[in-house]
Amino acid sequence: RTTEAFSTGNRYKEVDRDRQAGVIRSAEHAFSKDGGLAVLFGNIAE
């Protein structure tokens, strides 16, 4: 447990630099060709 909200000491050993299959991908290797970041609106965005 930590005393500071939303804090953690956990870190990955290496940075994810894989732009083809990693979490952050280049446009050429996107998860979906016609998708993008979702925009929240309404009650869920408040």
Swiss-Prot record:
GO biological process: isoleucine biosynthetic process; L-valine biosynthetic process
GO molecular function: 2 iron, 2 sulfur cluster binding; dihydroxy-acid dehydratase activity; metal ion binding
Source species, domain of life: Bacteria
Pathway involvement of the protein, from the record: Amino-acid biosynthesis; L-isoleucine biosynthesis; L-isoleucine from 2-oxobutanoate: step 3/4; Amino-acid biosynthesis; L-valine biosynthesis; L-valine from pyruvate: step 3/4
Keyword hit for Transmembrane helix: no
Keyword annotations: 2Fe-2S, Amino-acid biosynthesis, Branched-chain amino acid biosynthesis, Iron, Iron-sulfur, Lyase, Magnesium, Metal-binding
Co-factor note (free text): Binds 1 [2Fe-2S] cluster per subunit. This cluster acts as a Lewis acid cofactor.
Similarity field: Belongs to the IlvD/Edd family.
Main function: Functions in the biosynthesis of branched-chain amino acids. Catalyzes the dehydration of (2R,3R)-2,3-dihydroxy-3-methylpentanoate (2,3-dihydroxy-3-methylvalerate) into 2-oxo-3-methylpentanoate (2-oxo-3-methylvalerate) and of (2R)-2,3-dihydroxy-3-methylbutanoate (2,3-dihydroxyisovalerate) into 2-oxo-3-methylbutanoate (2-oxoisovalerate), the penultimate precursor to L-isoleucine and L-valine, respectively. Is specific for the (R) isomer of 2,3-dihydroxy-3-methylbutanoate, with no catalytic activity against the (S) isomer.
Oligomer and partners: Homodimer.
This protein's name: Dihydroxy-acid dehydratase
Species this protein is from: Rhodobacter capsulatus (Rhodopseudomonas capsulata)
